[in-house]
Amino acid sequence: MRILTHLAAALAATLALVGCDQQRISELEEGLSTEAEVRDRFGVPDHVWDEGGGARTLEYNRQPAGQRNYMITIGPDGTMSALRQVLTPQNFARITPGMDLGEVRRRLGRPAKVTPYALSGETHHDWRFLEPPQERKMFTVISTDGRTVARTQVGPDMDAPEHGGR
């Protein structure tokens, strides 16, 4: 019974967060919405990335509990030029061995967790995501030097309620 209660609570929290984000997104329009409107809907960004030429990208991270991260680009004129959910299989395919971990962070946002493994000398950077239609997965970037990608992998999110996690 306790597991069902935790599963129901986790599902309700996830649906509420997704619903809120969808409502916020529907209220914004590329080319028209201002940075003030974006911040009014989404709040203070987790990080602001300089794009050069006066443009910048606002990171709205939904990790560790959620499965989405949003990058919202504000052009030099102060209007929203792009709103992207970046935790997708297409974006993961662009993460390649040798890539700088800073670039990975820039593309995907802050990971859900970072776990060092002393015996193997590896560090795993994990992002939760939904693989269509609604399968909870984990994208992992593995580094052996702390600076670059050694390899990547996709697997089930073992922390998800359906796998006995929280």
Predicted regions and their residues:
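Residues within mature, well-folded domains
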Residues: 20-166
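Sec-dependent bacterial lipoprotein signal peptides
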Residues: 1-18
